[in-house]
Design a protein with these regions (language model features):
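Sec-dependent N-terminal signal peptides
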Residues: 4-13
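Sec/Tat signal peptide C-region and signal peptidase I cleavage site
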Residues: 13-20
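Exported/periplasmic ABC-transporter solute-binding proteins
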Residues: 20-269
Length: 269
């Protein structure tokens, strides 16, 4: 009897492993450092046979992973570029874009900085290197230290688009891999300035500045009052199937969108 039970247990375990699926999700740090791990944890509680591999290394890596077939879902904080669409088409890949949330790119300074608001023009001048001292924008004299995301980041390019009239960043700017790293550096540097997604505004030692009087809050993003707002995306190769489709549906469900809001982004519905 015991041998029979053991055999049945082994058979059930083997069957479970055969039906288990690993969902590979790559791309945006903005989405992948906090939101998707939380969604995955909640999804796995309902679907324990599903495992996740999540790599949050920048939007470009997520889009490239869809082109190369190394992920089922690509996370991105920017739309695909024409060059990426062409590269995908050459491999028979057609992007399916799904907006999963909205975000605001918040400009942050050290918590001890007296500056509480900047104009869009001042932000462009600071990040492009035209303005290099805080005294030029109402702060105490001191050289401005600029922290940006690296070039694989969707936020890197979106900030240039939304805040810098597509100009290049100052040569002195320091490129970092993620939102949390930028917040940490600005928090340590009294003269620091950088940008992060809404979900990262709780970092110690930093504060968000208003932009033309509008502060980066979920309410202002939702009301379209904050100028540096943008959608956040999942990309798949065509209409997703299987576990990928179910995870996308879960993200868009009331439960998933509640998690979007809880993490600090703006739900789409």
């Amino acid at each position: 009897m015991k041998k029979t039970l053991l055999a049945l247990t082994l058979l059930c375990t083997a069957a479970s492993l055969l039906h288990a699926e690993k969902l590979v999700i790559k791309g945006s740090d903005t989405i992948g450092a906090k939101l998707v791990p939380q969604l995955a944890e909640e999804y796995k509680a309902q679907h324990p046979d599903v495992s996740f591999e999540i790599a949050a290394e920048g939007s470009t890596t997520g889009i490239t992973a869809i082109i190369d077939g190394t992920a089922q879902i690509g996370m991105a904080s920017r739309p695909t570029k024409a060059t990426e669409v062409s590269a995908a088409a050459a491999k028979g890949v057609t992007f399916k874009e799904t907006i999963i949330a909205f975000d605001g790119i918040a400009v942050i300074v050290n918590g001890g900085n007296a500056v509480s608001s900047l104009t869009k023009k001042q932000i462009e001048q600071i990040f492009s290197g035209d303005v290099t001292d805080w005294s030029a924008v109402g702060g105490k004299p001191g050289p401005i230290s600029i922290y940006t995301r690296n070039t694989s980041s969707g936020t890197y390019s979106e900030f240039k688009e939304l805040a810098m009239s597509k100009r290049d960043y100052a040569g002195s700017s320091q490129k970092l891999a993620g939102n949390e790293q930028i917040a940490a550096e600005v928090g340590k540097n009294p003269n620091g300035i950088g940008y992060v997604g809404l979900a990262y505004l709780g970092a110690s030692g930093v504060k968000a500045v208003g932009v033309d009087g509008a502060v980066p809050t979920s309410a202002n993003v939702q009301a379209k009052k904050y100028p540096f707002a943008r959608p956040l995306y999942y990309y798949t190769n065509g209409t997703p199937a299987g576990e990928a489709a179910r995870f996308v549906e879960f993200t868009l469900s009331p439960t998933g969108q509640q998690t979007v809001s809880k993490v600090g982004f703006v739900a789409i519905k």
